[in-house]
């Protein structure tokens, strides 16, 4: 159960990777000087004026870690496979997440520390809601890297048919494909087409 929650939190952080990059671009204050009388402002001042971009950079590094973890997750199960009996694209969910939760942050001001704390709390609350409602799979960052979402029914030789699941895959899936799988929870799994 803890691994499932860890994976869900990781997918949510990964879904915010673009937001972290945009915030870094919007808020980084790195002084540039092209004259001969330039001097370094000091590491302490540089860090204190760039707290928000530094925090976003750390979370961006976490998102890279979770992306690499996700890419390798189906290697845990290279033996057991299921057959897809019904398949429908759900990739529009990524655009919904992008338009609803990431784009509005672009207009926010990050100058006031109280607002930054409120923004952080908002992102945490949205993450909790996404994880509790199992919408954490709607991930625009994965869409950029070629992952697709599918609503599928699967047939497992030992346990029969399971309906209405979400498959996340880098492959194009269709009915009658056999896929290796690794479940995040009861309804969402990573799929890799069996060759």
Swiss-Prot record:
The chain crosses the membrane at residues 10-30, 46-66, 117-137. Keywords: Antiviral defense, Cell inner membrane, Cell membrane, Membrane, Transmembrane, Transmembrane helix. GO terms for biological process: defense response to virus. It is a multi-pass membrane protein. Disulfide bonds: none annotated. InterPro entries: KwaA. Its main location: membrane. Disruption phenotype: Cannot be deleted in a Kiwa-containing strain of E.coli. It is found in: Cell inner membrane. One of its GO terms (cellular component) is plasma membrane. Signal peptide: none annotated. Component of antiviral defense system Kiwa, composed of KwaA and KwaB. Expression of Kiwa in E.coli (strain MG1655) confers resistance to phages lambda and SECphi18. This is Kiwa protein KwaA. The gene is kwaA.
